[in-house]
Structure formats: structure tokens, C-alpha cells
Design a protein with these regions (language model features):
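Rossmann-like NAD(P)(H) cofactor-binding subdomain of soluble oxidoreductases
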Residues: 104-171
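Glycine-rich Rossmann-fold phosphate-binding loop(s) that bind the pyrophosphate
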Residues: 23-24
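Conserved N-terminal Rossmann-fold NAD(P) cofactor-binding segment
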Residues: 2-17, 40, 46-94, 102-109, ...
């Protein structure tokens, strides 16, 4: 993904290879959305039972209307598969989406261990010129101050030189994911202007919703958290 023209060509030819790390409640529908758009997509998860079941053709999210039909189609078309082998999946991918849990602990402090663990793994296996998009909900500044530091930790990766990164926070409620993925606006922010444009171009192909361009990753994550707070307050009343 050296430039926008290359990305545009890879989208038109459907040659862009996608890896979604974390295929749970949000990650699996995300992966299916990219596969439905005609892009070769592989989902990675540490849950071996889940991966095996998916590869046998069993859709696990029975309470998500509309997705079982999509699942069956992309499986039949050969556009989606799952694996526990992150090394193999990343080595074949151009776009890596991180859809990992960031739960709150008993002190209401977010647990980013899943994201941090995966980023440590990526330092040795990420392909040159790959794009990482963090869909998980994270606090403003965590990507810039923590995740990039981890990715660059072995001195093999250098953001803006041999990989790039951005965010497009997921925006969906359990049980209504297909509706939300096709109706609710998404925030987009990249580490630089070109990355933001590339992410926007990709997501515009996959999701038929308004993409709201943010000036940077930190702002996108801040707006996402503000939206979550607003929603929770409304639910509370």
C-alpha cells in the first residue's frame, strides 16, 4: 500500500488481501463484510474450537440477523476462512484489522493486553507496506504512545516508512450489527493524511455508510469515546 493509486487498483481487481485479528461478536461480522465485498479475507482467533467450527461451515452468531446468509455465501465463494495461525495469515495479508476486546477491569481501567500481545507478534511478521487499522475502542493517545512504540520496538518496523496505521472504531450494538454496519456513520483517522485517505477508500467499498474524516487517530478515538458516553447516559435515563 505504497500509494493511493496502488490501493485503488487492488480494490478494483479484488487483489487486496485482508486479515481480521479477533473474530468474535464484532470481528466476525467485520470479516464477513470485507469478504462480501469480494476481498479475500482470513479471520484469526486464538479460540481453536471457534475456528474449526467456522471452517466446517457453522455460523456461531445465531442472534445476529442477516449474517448467516452472508456467511454461507462468502464461504461458498471461497472468500473467507479462519485460522489460529497468525503468522501464516499476516504473511499473506496487505490489510490487518484489529478487532480485539478492550474490557474494563474492576477499577474501570481498560485492559489492552490483547491488543498489546498481537502488536508484539506483528513486529516480526508484518509484511512491508502493510496497513493496520485498529477497530477496537481505545483511549485517545494509546495508539500513538503505546501501540506504535510496541510495533517499532524491534527496530524492524517504522511507521510511515515500511508500514502505516490508523483507526476506524467499530460502531455497532449486539443483535443489530448488520443494521448498524449499513446505517451508522464511521469515524476514520490515520497516522497521516495519505493513510486516512487509503482507509476511507477501502471502507467506502465495504460499508455503504457515511465516513466521517477525523484529523488524526487521537481525535477519532476521542470522538468515539464521547459517543459511547452519550449513548450510555441516554440508556441510563
Amino acid at each position: 500500500m505504497a500509494n493511493i493509486d496502488e490501493v485503488r487498483n487492488s480494490l478494483e481487481s479484488k487483489s487486496l488481501k485482508v486479515c481480521v485479528v479477533g473474530i468474535g461478536r464484532i470481528g466476525l461480522p467485520t470479516a464477513l463484510s470485507f469478504a462480501k465485498a469480494g476481498l479475500q479475507t482470513i479471520g484469526v482467533d486464538i479460540n481453536e474450537k471457534l475456528v474449526n467450527s467456522i471452517n466446517l461451515g457453522n455460523f456461531p452468531l445465531k442472534d445476529e440477523p442477516g449474517y448467516e446468509e452472508i456467511f454461507n455465501k462468502v464461504k461458498k465463494d471461497g472468500n473467507f476462512s479462519a485460522t489460529t495461525n497468525i503468522n501464516e495469515a499476516i504473511s499473506k495479508s496487505d490489510l490487518i484489522l484489529l478487532s480485539l476486546p478492550t474490557p474494563m477491569d474492576k477499577k474501570n481501567i481498560p485492559n489492552y493486553s490483547a491488543l498489546e500481545t498481537v502488536c508484539k507478534q506483528l513486529t516480526d511478521i508484518l509484511q512491508p507496506n502493510s496497513l493496520i487499522v485498529v477497530e477496537s475502542t481505545i483511549e485517545p493517545g494509546f495508539l500513538e504512545n503505546n501501540l506504535i512504540s510496541i510495533l517499532e520496538g524491534t527496530d524492524k518496523l517504522h511507521v510511515g516508512k515500511n508500514f502505516t496505521i490508523g483507526v476506524c472504531p467499530e460502531n455497532a450494538n449486539p443483535g443489530e450489527i448488520l443494521h448498524d454496519f449499513t446505517n451508522l456513520p464511521r469515524l476514520v483517522g490515520g497516522i497521516d493524511e495519505q493513510t486516512t485517505k487509503i482507509i476511507t477508500m477501502i471502507y467506502d467499498l465495504v460499508f455503504s455508510v457515511e465516513l466521517v474524516i477525523m484529523p488524526d487517530c487521537k481525535t477519532a478515538n476521542a470522538v468515539k469515546l464521547t459517543t459511547n458516553v452519550f449513548r450510555d447516559v441516554n440508556i441510563g435515563f
